[in-house]
């Protein structure tokens, strides 16, 4: 796709696409993020397109013969969105802003991957003007118009309305009671000042965190149409002087314990 690696360097200084994330708690071991960079002409600003690449693995205690949690919608659909946007945006003229394409590990384990990324970013977080996280957009949500995606925290910043004006099939999250803005990898970034939201079409289907979240249930024509609506708006965001901002009183704050 013409991307530069943005992960760890080896002893010879060669960059990898993989950013390893140490895991200090059980189950021990390691997870990782994957980072690709489409270098822009202005090194002072960047945008980020992200998803999480993990799911729940295998559960031997699950009822029935199928013990594998495939996670087709949650969140293989988001990882595919990041890859397809990289495919669409990579060729041709370089954008003004650098675009970071990031897939986080271990979102399902307390967001370990995104938290490590925040503590070890490939670029200062102050230079990331926006992050769009993609999560569960493999099926249409019956609560919104056909072919439409929704944005968590739509009312919090000027980013969602502006992307919609630029042609994105994007509306406000129809499930505010679910608090999805706080439940995805966008939230740790938002707490650090990045204008970060999640794009989704999750209609609260019954396959959430079940072994039945299978690729056979993905609506590929819907994914294709809805993601295609984002290509020009994201390209515009990468080339414009528009800088997203939280609206008055809407910047997220860390929950009190």
Stretch-by-stretch model annotation:
Residues 44, 94, 104-198, 202-207, ...:
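Metal-dependent peptidase/peptidase-like ectodomains
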Residues 1-8, 84-94, 119-123, 164-168, ...:
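Sec-exported extracytoplasmic/periplasmic mature domains
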Residues 1-38:
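A non-catalytic alpha/beta surface segment that caps or lines the substrate-entry region
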Residues 1, 32-102, 116, 122:
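Catalytic-core environment of secreted peptidases
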Residues 1-2, 13, 17, 34, ...:
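Stable alpha-helical elements in mature extracytoplasmic
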Residues 19-25, 33-34, 63-75, 90, ...:
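Second-shell loop/turn segments in exported
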Residues 87, 91, 206-257:
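His/Asp/Glu-rich mid-to-C-terminal helical/loop segments that flank catalytic regions of hydrolases
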Residues 95-106, 131-137, 243-256:
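Acidic/histidine-enriched alpha-helical segments
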């Amino acid at each position: 796709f013409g991307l530069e690696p943005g992960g760890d360097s080896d002893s010879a200084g060669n960059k990898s696409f993989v950013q390893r994330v140490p895991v200090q708690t059980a189950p021990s071991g390691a997870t990782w993020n994957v980072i690709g960079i489409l270098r822009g002409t202005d090194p002072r600003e960047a945008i980020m397109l992200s998803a999480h690449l993990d799911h729940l693995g295998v559960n031997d205690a699950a009822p029935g013969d199928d013990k594998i949690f495939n996670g087709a919608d949650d969140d293989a659909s988001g990882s595919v969105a990041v890859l397809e946007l990289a495919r669409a945006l990579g060729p041709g003229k370089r954008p003004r802003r650098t675009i970071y394409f990031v897939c986080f590990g271990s979102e399902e384990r307390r967001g370990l991957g995104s938290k490590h990324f925040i503590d070890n970013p490939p670029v200062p977080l102050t230079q990331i003007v926006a992050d769009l996280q993609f999560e569960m957009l493999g099926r249409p949500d019956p609560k919104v118009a056909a072919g439409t995606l929704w944005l968590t925290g739509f009312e919090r910043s000027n980013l969602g309305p502006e992307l919609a004006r630029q042609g994105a099939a994007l509306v406000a999250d129809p499930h505010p009671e679910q608090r999805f803005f706080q439940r995805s990898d966008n939230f740790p970034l938002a707490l650090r000042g990045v204008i970060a939201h999640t794009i989704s079409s999750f209609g609260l289907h019954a396959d959430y965190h079940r072994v039945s979240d299978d690729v056979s249930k993905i609506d590929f024509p819907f994914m294709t149409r809805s993601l295609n609506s984002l290509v020009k708006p994201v390209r515009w965001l990468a080339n414009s002087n528009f800088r997203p901002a939280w609206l008055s009183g809407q910047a997220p704050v860390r929950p009190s314990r």
